[in-house]
Amino acid sequence: MKLHELKSAPKSRNHKAKVVGRGHGSGLGKTSGRGQKGQKARKSGRTRPGFEGGQTPLYRRLPKFGFQTVGFKKQTLSVSLDIIAKLNETTIDRELLVKHGIISSKTNEPIKVIGNKIDKKIHLKINKISEGAKKAIQSAGGSIELI
């Protein structure tokens, strides 16, 4: 494919820009479809979002609430059992997940395995695991080592 062979998507070029203020014969001359005077006829003639005509707006009438401690929240990396099942490995740990590109090598966050279906026997060395994933691995004959 070359630059001169590129084509637009069908119907993507049908919209014509509205040309206004070019004489009364165009149908959109003089006031350009904005009517006569008034706030909406001016440039920037709209109110800001949340403005209620001078009345105290709802977002100021309601009390502030909540606080998020984003910097202190413990983050975990979730890895699904479906992804682990696709790996042709029997022992799975952080290094293996990094090697296969499932998690980044730069993160140091704990890994949590989630899911509830797996049919092959694996040995996991991870930080956390959900109850469903734990039952699924143990019923398939696998083992879990929490580190």
Swiss-Prot record:
Residues 22-36 have a biased composition (Gly residues). It comes from the Bacteria. One of its GO terms (cellular component) is cytosolic large ribosomal subunit. The keyword rRNA-binding applies. Binds to the 23S rRNA. Belongs to the universal ribosomal protein uL15 family. This is Large ribosomal subunit protein uL15. It comes from Mycoplasmoides gallisepticum (strain R(low / passage 15 / clone 2)) (Mycoplasma gallisepticum). The gene is rplO.
